[in-house]
Amino acid sequence: MRNRFERQLLELNNELIQMGSMIERAIEMGISALVRQDVEKAKKAIAYDEEIDEQEKTVESLCMKLLLQQQPVAKDLRLISAALKMITDMERIGDHAADISEMTILMSDATYERSAINIDLVESMAKETTDMVIKCVDAFVNKDMELARTVIAQDDVVDDLFADFKQQLIKKINENVKNGEQATDMLSGSSIRSRESTRSRKLV
């Protein structure tokens, strides 16, 4: 009985790793569509969110089987509960990525001046966030508390990037009012990215 339970736990870990990879891809697709104003990629990112939703259901179903068909002890119950919370948070991060893509489509009529916006900061925020998601899953699967602590600290890095981004946008708006709408749009996108980082921190 216990051997079967351990095999199912291994399957759960593999499915969590798969979902983490999907979230990483969703974030990359969303930010790429945003900074390049790629409407087609934005549409694909929105459609991809449905696949993430299906993966969440797969993991949730596996957790329910572990709870109902096996006889988990207290530490196993904590593990399964943590997995359920993790997939909920990851699914919401996927939703945020889709939100950014929807915003990209709404902004598609505007022509953006790269000089008006620090794209590098936006991409850095996305890179940090995806790295946090992958580390969170790795920390959970490998029960690595030290790695989990680095993720918590990494959220501060994203917060600092977002603060820098806001300050630069305010400066750009003051210098050139016509870029104000562009700046506001990108601020909305980077704000969503910051919330993704905060939710990534909650995974650990």
Protein language model features and the residues they cover:
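Cytosolic, long alpha-helical scaffolding segments
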Residues: 1-204
